[in-house]
């Protein structure tokens, strides 16, 4: 199954959640398309579980097969499977770039990482799904820092609010991973227990 690259607002409306962040079109019409979208049908337990999984997938830009691997790993780790799943998704390099304020959306962050603009601990990484670890140091490559986008991002970072588990140094465009996030620190509107129930069947 290919990655969805169509209008993000359409997916947001279908799943009734802003998958982009600051999507004004979704805020104007936060209901599913068609029939004015306002009439809510009675949703089965399975449908709710499926929607929650799709919400997680599209929020983080993950394919179905890849998402199953994340779930399998989350299930093997100690602790709550649902919490582990969200933490694994949040620890993706593209998401960290987005959370740090170096990209407006996760989709843009994924493109920036894919194009090789970042290093992790001095090594060039162009894999968006690369999992960061505690104490990792993420830098924008020196030649990439001259790009207009990063120059503008550098100015915006002065007023940016980043999660407590990250630190950003605006002057050098450096991201420091102080620790991996805890579930309570991740502000995504997910009911991950529904996903666990879906895969537990």
Swiss-Prot record:
Quaternary organization: Part of the 30S ribosomal subunit. Contacts protein S5. The interaction surface between S4 and S5 is involved in control of translational fidelity.
Record bears the keyword Ribonucleoprotein: yes
Keyword Nucleotide-binding: no
Matching PANTHER family: 30S 40S RIBOSOMAL PROTEIN, SMALL RIBOSOMAL SUBUNIT PROTEIN US4M
Entry-linked InterPro entries: Ribosomal_uS4 (IPR022801), Ribosomal_uS4_bac-type (IPR005709), Ribosomal_uS4_CS (IPR018079), Ribosomal_uS4_N (IPR001912), S4_RNA-bd (IPR002942), S4_RNA-bd_sf (IPR036986)
Protein name: Small ribosomal subunit protein uS4
A molecular function (GO) term: structural constituent of ribosome
Entry's Gene Ontology cellular component terms: small ribosomal subunit
Domain S4 RNA-binding: 91-151
The species this protein was found in: Corynebacterium diphtheriae (strain ATCC 700971 / NCTC 13129 / Biotype gravis)
Gene3D superfamilies xrefs: Ribosomal Protein S4 Delta 41, Chain A, domain 1, RNA-binding S4 domain
Record CDD domains: S4
Keywords: Ribonucleoprotein, Ribosomal protein, RNA-binding, rRNA-binding
Assigned protein family: Belongs to the universal ribosomal protein uS4 family.
């Amino acid at each position: 199954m290919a990655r969805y690259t169509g209008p993000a607002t359409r997916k947001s409306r279908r799943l009734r959640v802003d998958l982009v962040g600051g999507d004004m079109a979704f805020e104007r019409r936060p209901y599913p398309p068609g029939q004015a979208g306002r009439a809510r049908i009675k949703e089965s337990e399975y449908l709710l579980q499926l929607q929650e999984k799709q919400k997680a997938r599209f929020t983080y830009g993950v394919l179905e097969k890849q998402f199953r691997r994340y779930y399998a790993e989350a299930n093997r780790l100690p602790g709550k499977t649902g919490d582990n799943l969200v933490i694994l998704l949040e620890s993706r390099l593209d998401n960290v770039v987005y959370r740090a304020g170096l990209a407006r959306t996760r989709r843009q962050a994924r493109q920036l990482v894919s194009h090789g603009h970042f290093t992790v601990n001095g090594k060039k990484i162009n894999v968006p799904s690369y999992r960061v670890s505690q104490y990792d140091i993420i830098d924008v490559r020196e030649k990439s820092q001259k790009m207009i986008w990063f120059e503008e991002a550098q100015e915006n970072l002065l007023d940016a609010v980043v999660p407590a588990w990250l630190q950003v140094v605006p002057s050098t465009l450096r991201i420091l991973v102080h620790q991996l996030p805890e579930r309570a620190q991740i502000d995504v509107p997910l009911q991950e227990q529904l996903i666990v129930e879906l895969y537990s069947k």
